[in-house]
Regions:
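Membrane-interface "cap" regions at the ends of multi-pass membrane proteins
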Residues: 1-38, 51-52, 56, 374, ...
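Helix-loop-helix junctions that connect adjacent transmembrane segments
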Residues: 1, 37, 41, 114-120, ...
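Hydrophobic transmembrane alpha-helices that form the core helical bundles
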Residues: 29, 52-129, 134-137, 280-300, ...
Length: 430
């Protein structure tokens, strides 16, 4: 691969990959977990710090190994079964749950905006998935063009909400001292809030794949991750502060429509609806982005003959080059998830599963430092081993507290992931 990505391009990729729908819709569940404005802001800051440390840690593996993506990082570090399980989890949980969750919140917001019965939200969500599937069948170029346009559009509502809320605050917000009002105690409130907030930071791992294409990864990769995720964290904190400066906190707790009502309060009936349309476009774009990348996971596994039916799943359309059967598989699972789950359940499950593997990747950095000290490392994690340890401790905290506080959800997430084991061994024997 040519080394052609500059610092500014890497920075733009960080920001563009991470900012999505979570910032608009997660304040309801976070505030419900923490019970206070101060702890809600603290959770966003902690999520930013953990994501930055994880990004800096995983980037060391990305720069050192001449392979493609986290599946092959795990193959190299732990053996093929771990890479397969990660790919299986991406295929059966992560990408379908992302698509289903985003389509579900689109449906929920659309019926509120249009004044339709709430019962129609799942049908609208299913319609969004099917429409995006058809757009992606036209080919990567059409889908990527739409993604570029929406990336610009999604920043406009963020900017407007922050600026107008700061200029015209309507509620006094107390950020000190930090208090947690949770029935499960301080740890439960913060951990459940973190699980929700980390959904809004999903996408940073994409940036680690840029390491071997950067002109100067040793200098620029850490800067791009630290500055990019720091800017994202600042934006998230400001947007959430803006919501709390516009609406009373008790009206935000557990409210999935916070962004809509805050927009109405700031911009009036007509202006609020226009801003909400911009937010819906942001959700739509995020959903398309995950569909665009998600349908390639079963395709990649099938190319290596690691799945039953690999011959079909590895086929691409002659006209568009799109892996049609892989796309059908991802979208079929997403439609099932829409019918069975909701936005909060789906996002919590995908974050739990993803951070299980992210933590393994952070441990792999320490493992490879011991096992292969002479491995060429164009980029090395700064402040080693402090940064990797923060990533590992943060990941373990999320995993353990999710098992304690949301046992059924964690069992479902891990259960689906572990279903990959019989598939792996069956395929190995045949």
């Amino acid at each position: 691969m040519k080394k052609q990505i500059s610092f500014s391009q890497a920075l733009a990729t960080v920001i563009g990959s991470v900012i999505g729908a979570g910032v608009f819709f997660k304040i309801g569940s976070i505030s419900q977990s923490t019970g206070s404005a101060s702890a809600t802001i603290l959770v966003w800051l902690l999520a930013g710090v953990i994501s930055i440390c994880s990004g800096l840690t995983v980037s060391e593996i990305a720069a050192a190994l001449n392979v493609n993506g986290a599946i092959e990082y795990l193959d190299y570090s732990y053996g093929n079964i771990w890479g397969f399980l990660f790919g299986w989890a991406e295929m059966t949980v992560y990408f379908p749950a992302q698509i289903a969750a985003l389509a579900s919140i689109f449906g929920q917001q659309f019926v509120v905006l249009a004044g339709l019965p709430a019962s129609g939200s799942k049908w609208i969500a299913a319609g969004v998935v099917l429409l995006l599937f058809l757009i992606n069948m036209l080919g990567t170029r059409a889908s990527a063009w739409m993604q570029s346009v929406i990336t610009v559009i999604k920043l406009i509502p963020l900017f407007l909400i922050i600026v107008f809320a700061i200029i015209r605050p309507q509620v006094s917000v107390s950020l000190w001292p930090v208090t947690v009002d949770s029935s499960g105690g301080w740890l439960a409130g913060i951990s459940q809030g973190l699980l929700s907030a980390l959904f809004a930071f999903e996408g940073w791992i994409v940036v680690t794949n840029l390491a071997k294409e950067m002109k100067n990864p040793k200098k620029d990769l850490a800067r791009a991750i630290i500055l990019g995720l720091s800017l994202v964290t600042v934006v998230y904190v400001l947007v959430n502060y803006a919501f709390m400066a516009v609406l009373p906190f008790d009206k935000i707790i557990g409210n999935d429509n916070t962004a809509y009502y805050a927009s109405l309060k700031l911009f009036g009936q007509a202006g609020g609806k226009i801003v909400t349309v911009g937010i819906l476009l942001s959700v739509y774009g995020a959903c398309n982005g995950f569909m665009l990348t998600g349908m390639r996971t079963p395709y990649i596994l099938a190319q290596a003959n690691r799945l039953p039916g690999s011959e079909k799943l590895a086929k691409t359309s002659v006209r568009s080059g799109v892996p049609v059967f892989s796309a059908l598989l991802i979208n079929a699972i997403a439609l099932i998830m829409i019918s069975l789950g909701n936005f909060e359940i789906l996002t919590d499950m995908l974050v739990f599963v993803m951070w299980t593997f992210t933590t393994l990747l952070s441990v792999a950095v320490i493992l490879l430092r011991k096992r292969e000290p002479d491995l060429a490392r164009p980029f090395m994690t700064p402040a080693y081993p402090v940064i990797p340890l923060i990533s590992i401790i943060g990941g373990l905290f999320i995993i353990v507290m999710t098992v304690i506080n949301q046992f059924a959800l964690s069992v479902i997430g891990l259960g689906i992931t572990l279903l990959g084991l019989p598939v792996y061994y069956w395929k190995k024997l045949h």
